[in-house]
Amino acid sequence: VPFMKKMEEQNMDVDFIPIHHYWNWYADEGAQAFLDLVDETWKMYHKPIWITEFAISGDPGKTKFQRKVVMRYMKKVIAGLDKRDYVERYAWFSFSPTDYKNGGSGLLNHYEGKITDLGYLYQKLGMPKGYDRNNPVKAKANPKEDVIKKYYITVK
């Protein structure tokens, strides 16, 4: 909040509010708590929300039960995000399925180059409102100095 207060004091604004969050591996309570966090963030700022990273953490995903819990969490959260007009973007953070702590959240097996069952589910579930499959974002490299000159601002 101090950052936002400084922005306001200098008559500046932001275009959106980013959220980056991970819940533990319980699905139902965690999914609702995450959606509540999104709602509270909206109520606080009344700005579009971009969820830069979300997933379940603390889950080795080594059992069939745990993988089902992760899938249930993903389904519930994405359905909830898609119902909220103020959520413009979201991205599941994909750990590798071989990651000791967070493997149950992996969308891609990096070693085999194969999409996981969770990856296929994510692909099917929906798209953030701001994403257009027909108009993918193309990144363009900028020299560091040009970026600094163009976008640097001082917040006192």
Question: Where in the sequence are the language-model features?
Answer:
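Aromatic-rich peripheral "rim/lid" segments of glycoside hydrolase catalytic domains that contact
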Residues: 59-64, 68, 72, 76, ...
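Aromatic- and acid-rich polysaccharide-binding/catalytic face
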Residues: 2-40, 44-60, 88, 92-95
